[in-house]
C-alpha cells in the first residue's frame, strides 16, 4: 500500500535480481535500435548481394550461418527484430521465397549456444557461475554448426512441401 509508505519491492528483494542478465538484454535491444536508426541496417542488407545467383540451398545455408553466428553477439530478439525486415526485402533479389528466408531467420535466431548474450537460457546458465565462457564457446560452436545444417535442411524441405512460390 503506497499510502502507508509500503513499497512494491524493497532492496532486499532487488538485491536478488540478476541485473547482469537484464543489462545484457537491454543492451541487445538498444543495439538493434541503433543499427536501424544509424542506417547500418541498410549497409547490412546491401551485403546480401553476395548471395545473388547462388543455388537456393546455399542461400539458405548462408542466411542460417549469418543469423546463428550474429545472434552470438546480441540478443536473439534484437537480432530477429533487425534482420527479419532486411531479409524479407532481400529475399526476392536472392531468388528464394520470402517465407523461407523468414523461417530460417526466425528459427536460426533462437539457435545460438556460444555466448551468454545470445539467448535467455545461455544468460541464465552463465549467471550461475558454474560454466565459463570458454566452455560455452567450445560446446556451442559445434551445436551452432549442427543447427545450421538441420535448420537449413528443414527449411528447404518445408519450402518444397508447402510449395512456396519462387520470386519472379
Where are these regions (language model features)?
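Transmembrane helical cores of multi-pass ion-transport proteins
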Residues: 1-168
Amino acid at each position: 500500500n503506497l499510502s502507508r509508505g509500503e513499497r512494491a519491492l524493497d532492496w532486499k528483494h532487488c538485491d536478488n535480481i540478476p541485473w547482469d542478465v537484464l543489462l545484457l538484454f537491454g543492451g541487445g535491444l538498444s543495439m538493434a535500435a541503433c543499427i536501424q536508426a544509424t542506417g547500418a541496417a541498410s549497409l547490412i542488407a546491401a551485403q546480401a548481394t553476395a548471395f545473388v545467383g547462388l543455388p537456393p540451398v546455399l542461400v539458405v545455408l548462408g542466411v542460417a550461418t549469418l543469423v546463428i553466428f550474429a545472434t552470438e553477439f546480441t540478443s536473439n530478439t534484437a537480432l530477429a527484430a533487425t534482420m527479419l525486415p532486411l531479409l524479407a526485402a532481400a529475399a526476392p533479389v536472392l531468388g528464394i521465397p520470402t517465407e523461407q528466408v523468414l523461417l530460417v531467420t526466425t528459427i536460426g535466431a533462437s539457435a545460438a549456444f556460444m555466448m551468454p548474450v545470445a539467448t535467455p537460457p545461455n544468460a541464465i546458465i552463465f549467471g550461475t557461475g558454474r560454466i565459463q565462457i570458454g566452455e560455452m564457446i567450445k560446446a556451442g560452436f559445434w551445436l551452432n554448426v549442427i543447427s545450421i545444417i538441420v535448420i537449413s535442411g528443414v527449411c528447404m524441405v518445408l519450402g518444397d512441401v508447402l510449395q512456396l512460390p519462387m520470386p519472379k
